[in-house]
Regions:
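Alpha-helical structural elements of signaling/regulatory helical domains
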Residues: 16-17, 34, 45
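Short, surface-exposed ligand-recognition loops at beta-strand->loop->(often short) alpha-helix junctions
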Residues: 10-22
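Non-catalytic surface loops within mature trypsin-like serine protease
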Residues: 13-15, 59, 93-96
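Short, well-ordered beta-strand segments in beta-rich or mixed alpha/beta enzyme
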Residues: 5-11, 40-67
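Intrinsically disordered, low-complexity acidic/polar segments
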Residues: 18-20, 50, 62, 98
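Glycine-rich beta-strand-turn "strand-cap" elements at beta-sheet edges
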Residues: 1-5, 38-49, 75-101
């Protein structure tokens, strides 16, 4: 399987809430989902409150279907109180690379 759809999110946690945000993301229901091929959570090297998520999915439809479901919406609801400012979300078209976690 190859990732045909990419998704990137950058979020800023409320002061002192980044670890909680990261824990929720690393327990995300998308991790065991068969159509989610890449799910990478990282913290900014220059601002520990900024958290990045990079995802690779088998298709845009699979990503959309998953995030329209109850599990994903429940996760989003848990994340919202931990965030401050405007988060950025970007859809992407993967062209290659490597991931070993």
């Amino acid at each position: 399987m190859t990732a045909q759809h990419g998704f990137q999110a950058t979020m800023t946690a409320q002061p002192g809430k980044a670890d909680e945000l990261i824990k929720l993301l690393l327990d995300a229901p998308s991790l065991p989902h068969d159509d989610c091929l890449v799910f990478l959570v990282s913290r900014s090297a220059s601002n520990p409150d900024v958290v990045h998520v990079i995802e690779g999915w088998t298709s845009a439809e699979a990503h959309s279907a998953f995030f329209g479901g109850e599990q994903a919406q429940a996760l989003v609801a848990k994340l919202q109180p931990l965030l401050t400012g405007e988060s950025t979300y970007t859809d992407a078209v993967p062209v290659g690379g490597k991931a070993t976690l």
